[in-house]
C-alpha cells in the first residue's frame, strides 16, 4: 500500500504518474505493461525502418530511377547516417520544449507523412508530379575509353528523394533518441536490474522488427512490387502510432526540464578560452540564487554550477570512449550498403524451379521468385535474437558467478575485433568475385525487373560476414548503449544517449564520404563503364582500407579504455561521480 500511495502523490517536478496505477494490479504490473507497449512500438517502428533501408539500394537502382550503384550506395549511407546524426535534435526538442511523450507522438506523425511521400514516388503519376519526366538515357556505341560515361551526373529525382529521406531520418532519429529513454523511465522505479534487462529486450525487439521486415517486406519489395512493400511500411508506422496513443494511460510522462547544452558550451569555452569574459559572466541562475538561503537554493530547478562542472568532467571522460567507436560504425553500416551491393553481383538462387526453355525476359514472373538479397541480413538478426536471451539468462550469470564477467568497455573491444574480421571476410570474398569477372565468367540474373551480371559465386558465401557483424553488434552496440546510459549523470542521460547515437551516424556519414572520395576519377570505386553495377570497381580494396582504419582505432580504444578504467578505480573520482549521480 505504501508503494501505491507513493504513486498517487503528485510529483514536484510535474511528472505525471499513470492513471491506471491506482487499480488492483498495483504499480509494478503497470510498469511492465508500459514497458511492453514501448517495446511493441519500437518493434513496429524498426520493422518499417528496415523495410526502407534493406532494399533502398535496389529501389534507387531500379528502372524507376536508374541510379548507378555508387549513387545508390552513397544515398543509403547518408540516410542511415542522418537517422543517427539527427538524434540530438529530437532529444533537445524533448528536453526543452515538448517532453518525451509529445516528442515521440509528433515524430511518429512525421514518420507517417514521410513514408507516405516515399510511397507516392513509386507510382508513375506521383513520380511525375514530384520529379517530372525521367530524362532519356542516350544510346551510344560501346566506348573502350576509361572516360566513357554510362549515366548522367545528377541522378533522377535526387532532390525529392533526398528531402523525403531527410524527413524520414529526422523522424526515425527522434523516435530512437526519445523512445529509448522514455522506456527506461517506465521501469526506473523497479531497480537497476530492471533497467539493464529493459535495454537487452529493447535491442531484442529492434531485431524482432527487423526479422518481420526482412522476411515479409523485403521479399514483397524484391519479388512482387515496391508499391505493396511500401504500403505495408506505412501501415506499420500507423499501427505503432495507434498503439502508442492507446497506451497513454499507463505511461509515466515527464515535463521538459531544459537542456544543458548552453552550460556545457559555457564550460568548454571557459576551459579553452579563459580570457573571454563573455563566457565567464554569471548565469541568471547564479544571480537569482545569490540572495537565497541554502535550503531555498536547493529547491531551484536545474543543476547547480558545481553539478554543471562535474557533468562536464564526466563528459570529457566518456566522449573519447564513444568517439573511438566511430570507425566501428563505419564498418557496421556497410551491412546495409556495400554488402547489399556486393550481394546483388553474386549468384542468387531461385526459390522455385524455372523452365530452362523460357526466355530470360519471361523469367521475371511469379514462378521465378528469387531469394531477396536483403535476407542475408537475417544471419545478422538471427544471431542477435538467439544470443541475447542466451547471454542474458545463461552466459552472463555463469561468468558473474565465476567472477569473469567482462566490463562494458572490454565487451566493446571484443565487438571491434568481430567487426574487423567481418570486413576482412567481405574483402576476401570481393577479391575472389573480381577474379571471376576478370575471367569473363558472369551469370546474367534478373532481380525484379533489373538485369545484373553476377559472378558464379553463391550469395551464401556472404553469410560469414553477416554472422560476424551480428556477433560484433552484441558486444559493441549493446554494451555501448548500456555504457552511455549508466556512466552518465542522471541530469545528462538524455544528452549522452543522443551523443552516442549521433556518433554512430558520424560513422555512417564518414563511410559515405569515403565512398564518394574513392569514386573520383582514379579512385578504387570509380567505374564509369558500369551502369548500375560494380564489376569494374575495386571494392575489395575499400573493404581492406576500412579494416585497417578499424584496427588502428581499436588499439587507440584499448589505450583510452584502460585510462578510463584506472580513473574509475581512483577513490576520489568515484566519490565525485557518485555525488553527481545522486
From Swiss-Prot:
Belongs to the major facilitator superfamily. Proton-dependent oligopeptide transporter (POT/PTR) (TC 2.A.17) family. Glycans are attached at residues 178, 223, 357, 440, 575. The gene is Slc15a3. PANTHER family: OLIGOPEPTIDE TRANSPORTER-RELATED. It holds the Pfam family PTR2. InterPro entries: MFS_trans_sf, POT_fam, PTR2_symporter_CS. It catalyses: N-acetyl-D-muramoyl-L-alanyl-D-isoglutamine(out) + n H(+)(out) = N-acetyl-D-muramoyl-L-alanyl-D-isoglutamine(in) + n H(+)(in); glycylglycylglycine(out) + n H(+)(out) = glycylglycylglycine(in) + n H(+)(in); carnosine(out) + n H(+)(out) = carnosine(in) + n H(+)(in); L-histidine(out) + n H(+)(out) = L-histidine(in) + n H(+)(in). One of its GO terms (molecular function) is symporter activity. GO terms for cellular component: endosome membrane; lysosomal membrane. Proton-coupled amino-acid transporter that transports free histidine and certain di- and tripeptides, and is involved in innate immune response. Also able to transport carnosine. Involved in the detection of microbial pathogens by toll-like receptors (TLRs) and NOD-like receptors (NLRs), probably by mediating transport of bacterial peptidoglycans across the endolysosomal membrane: catalyzes the transport of certain bacterial peptidoglycans, such as muramyl dipeptide (MDP), the NOD2 ligand. Keywords: Endosome, Glycoprotein, Immunity, Innate immunity, Lysosome, Membrane, Peptide transport, Protein transport, Symport, Transmembrane, Transmembrane helix, Transport. This is Solute carrier family 15 member 3. Residues 1-20 are annotated as: Disordered. The chain crosses the membrane at residues 33-53, 77-97, 102-122, 155-175, 201-221, 232-252, 312-332, 371-391, 409-429, 466-485, 498-518, 541-561. Abundant expression in lung, spleen and thymus, and detected faintly in brain, liver, adrenal gland and heart at protein level. It is found in: Lysosome membrane; Endosome membrane.
